[in-house]
Amino acid sequence: MKRRQFIASLASATAATALAKTKAVASPLIGIQVAGHSLLDEGMERCLDTIQATCHANAIFLYSHSYYAAHGRAPELYADHGVPIRDERRRKITRVWLRHHPEAFKNTSLAMPEPTDEYGDRDLFAETVEACKKRGLKFYARILEPDTSKLTGRVANFEQGMSVGLDGKISAQPCRNNPQWMAWWDAIVSDTMKSYPLDGFQWGAERMGPLSSVLWKGAIPFCFCEHCETRAKREGINAARARQGFGELHAFITKLHAGVAAPSDGVFTNVMRLLMKFPEVIAWDYQWRVALEEQGQRVFKLVKAERQSAHVGRHFDHQNTSWDAIFLAQWSYADVAPFADFIKPILYHDILAPRLANQLAELKRGPLAELSLPQSLELFYSLRGYDSKLQPKLDELNVRGMDPEYVGIETRRIVDVVQGRCSVVPGIGVDVPNTALEAPNGGKRPSDQLALRAAIKNAFTAGAGGILISREYDEMRLESLKTIGETLKELGQV
């Protein structure tokens, strides 16, 4: 996008959303994330009865496409809602929950298949529109950007829209500079809004950039396709030096992961030395983020073009909101606000603790090798402004959750940054399981009810415009749903 086009789109989008943003702040959004199979397994009316009678949600957030979602969980990780629990691992459930118009995808070779798996014969979006309308519930579509593993065998020609690694092979992420991907993604958004009278559309991309991916995981750097190189040239970035810098950084991290002795002058020093020697690496990584935000700007404009009153939500996952310092530094929430009616940061206090343990272990193998794990944890708490006396110690990360102060601090941080330009609707984690290998208690992590109450209260005290009850309804115990409803009533939010 050229600079003058960007400025023009920014101005028009800001003007177009002033009214919508006022509404978003005035009326608390109490949403709940539901998977399509939950509505059908439990029965639409029964499921909505349960939701309204317990947590008092006023909005249903349903996947339009569940390519990237919580799939393949053991039955023990589902909550008992009074109906038989089916083993999802033995099922082949559709990943498309609505009906598309083929002509919407005329500008891309990525083919949207007809739903043929279990429940593929149901237009669940049409059914949910009617069910929500009768009950006075708002209905929002939600979608997470899929990756290579989720598209394989499901979307024909998807390879033509994916990133290309330094090794010349297809990478996990899509390339947001690739016209094929852009046309496919834009068609999904536009056709979804055109086809159904939705109250809103929430999208997210649970991604790390190329630099974070190398430093955290030792992943092969990306994207070096022709479209990214064209963009780099336009921005004055030397692609050859970016390739060289990423290559040397990847080789260094790979050796560390293989157990090669660290250099005598230190791992962190050598990482910084490479970044200073090759500033093109940081520039290349930044353009990855700019392209991601341009995708968000297109989503906003496409949704508003079809339905001006619809709310556009931006989902940021745990790595985006909490531990990926590079992602957080690249782009301020203030820069996101003009293209969102609300921002939904994942602030799942319970499950963050074991996830954080995994991230610290990965950093220990790479750029933070000189720090002990307790030192890294203390550094994280200090950088994010958390009280280490309240938060779990290293040996507690896998057995208890974060103190709910986490929810309040991160909500307030975003509220202060966006300054009323959009609403902040944090995702409150409810009974989210730990799906890591060898997780304690088989992965079950039932929410502490007092902590759940505190998390909700902290969110609203910090200025939240609502909450999004997360991660998935099928994981939420009735006890937790009732606790949420009672807390919201106590706060006067329902």
Task: For each feature predicted by the language model, list its residue ranges.
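Active-site-adjacent "subsite" loops/lids of carbohydrate-active enzymes
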Residues: 111-114, 140-196
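Active-site clefts of carbohydrate-active enzymes
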Residues: 279, 311-320, 377-398, 410-446
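N-terminal export signals
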Residues: 5-24
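Substrate-binding cleft of secreted/luminal carbohydrate-active enzymes
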Residues: 340-354, 400-413, 420-486
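Aromatic-lined carbohydrate-binding/catalytic grooves of carbohydrate-active enzymes
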Residues: 57-117
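Aromatic-lined carbohydrate-recognition surfaces of secreted/lumenal glycan-active proteins
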Residues: 140-144, 148, 202, 245-250, ...
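Aromatic- and acidic-residue-enriched segments that line the glycan-binding/catalytic groove
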Residues: 72-93, 147-169, 206-270, 356-371, ...
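Catalytic domains of carbohydrate-active enzymes, especially glycoside hydrolases
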Residues: 46-69, 195, 462-466
